[in-house]
């Protein structure tokens, strides 16, 4: 027996004979579509196939998953295939309708929980004052502007708008004014903007607006219960049970989550028993939410908020619950939406009226973000991007529209127009955000040379270090120690960025560490503290501590966009050099290194330690007693990268325990291998300046080495490579160099350049550490 509500508000009971869930098959004379399991699988297959087709067609516009899914549902509904009466009788009969409705509710229960559990409420605190002001403005301004627009519409149009009475139009206005952080998170994740400045500001602002919205919603429900009941003890009971439910979710469920975290070893995924426990808690919270008078989604959202944001929940929930939800439950969800959208029920007047209201509210959302952001001096490009992000709608919005329709708070016509409007606006706004953000990224150019070669001596040398593995921290600190000038005439500004890969579907973070302050008592926090303490010890170990400043950050971001935090910090701090520590040349490290090199606003040096560099902690003592010498080699073949390498090597000669040997590679006629006349002239000036600057330094030597082909270079490095502790080389060289011909064919770590890759190759078996340097990529041309 199934129970449904008809259009006139009465209940309709449908009784059907139980045939079983599985068919015996066509060969036995059974009709598979009369059984629930084959019918469900067929509908899922149809939606998945259609979604893939629409995904391919809309790919040039933007990556809007929800649009393609809803389109698939609409295509199966009365707007397209649903016009075929025979098909409707087969696929969308009474039995299938109730199957779809049930799975639709289950789907949204899981979607709302997973999308909420992904987001850390700490984003609000990190957003600062601007996020609070933006959130308050985003909560109030669209509603006020929408109310004015609603008044204009009702006063100028006779009758109803899309069969909505004034109360229904007000419900439409209220829900169009709301922005959901679950939608924003999904969009930012798809566009790989979670760890961008606009992404962080958008997410924190929307979460603040949602906090105001949820608070207002609870007050409204409480006020409504008082308004419609006599003042007695029973009046307070509904309010008390609602509060008790929310408190119970926190008090009961949070300890269970913490128990699961303790029982799950680090790096391991959720056990099946723990996953079942979470599902039971979710179903219980949802059921109790509906029982006490809340919409059922409140229970799943509340449970998502109390779910810890630490592993194993980030990857475990998405990999196990999320995959099933989006692959199996989501198709049923979009079919239920598509069956309620009928293009043939629309008329032009209703479309224009509702679009005017929706567009006005979207414009108010845009203004409520852009104006406060500009007042707080946020770059106009970032403010505009955030403004468009808050206008994007998604699956979450559509489900809220569906709830309004189920409770008769809006008409079928209004629901259809709102769904189509959400799809069109989201496609347009997502495409705008994607292209505008890409343009902003490409505009990350500097208006001065940020290189070691063009460093101004009267200013501090600014170096940003970044590393994916802790093992690379000691050699990086050693290189920093070598480049530090012991005199008081020069100062050093160091920024360290500890890179951590984001647990899937958690919120990206950029954490600044302060001396003596621990953020959390977790394993990851302990590692971060150790790294920040190492850099602080580096600073405190100098006699002239006032000449060395250190800032430590941890960037938690997806691996594909991790470089954006590095480059954004380098741009903000105006660093002259980025030093990237490479441990073993894994694919992830190489991709990250490549992205940093391509997007960096300054010069980049890639350090690959092979064990010869001493520990920086012992260098001070060894320098005083003269027991340590560090031999450095700089290979000069020609070009911008080699000039940058030489400039950095010369700076290291300020340390009395450093011996520098510059190997200038020339052909048989004592001529540079370069063909470019301008580059030759720049190389000549650089070498002449080097000779003048190091004339009185006894720890510097320049040798010109005759090299005609690649085999000569290989023999030179094999014979002399182990004489040095550190070999410095440029990454990029002219492709026409005969001396490098054939080396790139056997390259294993091409991010180090041809010579750098040769130095770390297994063929040479060298123990010297390698520092490969790339000068700043810029359109600025050096004076000839």
Curated annotation (Swiss-Prot):
It is found in: Membrane. Expressed in pollen. It is a multi-pass membrane protein. GO terms for biological process: potassium ion transport; proton transmembrane transport. Its main location: membrane. GO terms for molecular function: antiporter activity. Keywords: Antiport, Ion transport, Membrane, Potassium, Potassium transport, Transmembrane, Transmembrane helix, Transport. Pfam families: CHX17_C (PF23259), Na_H_Exchanger (PF00999). The chain crosses the membrane at residues 38-58, 61-81, 97-117, 130-150, 201-221, 240-260, 286-306, 321-341, 351-371, 376-396, 413-433. One of its GO terms (cellular component) is membrane. May operate as a cation/H(+) antiporter. Belongs to the monovalent cation:proton antiporter 2 (CPA2) transporter (TC 2.A.37) family. CHX (TC 2.A.37.4) subfamily. This is Cation/H(+) antiporter 26. It comes from Arabidopsis thaliana (Mouse-ear cress). The lineage of its organism: Eukaryota, Viridiplantae, Streptophyta, Embryophyta, Tracheophyta.
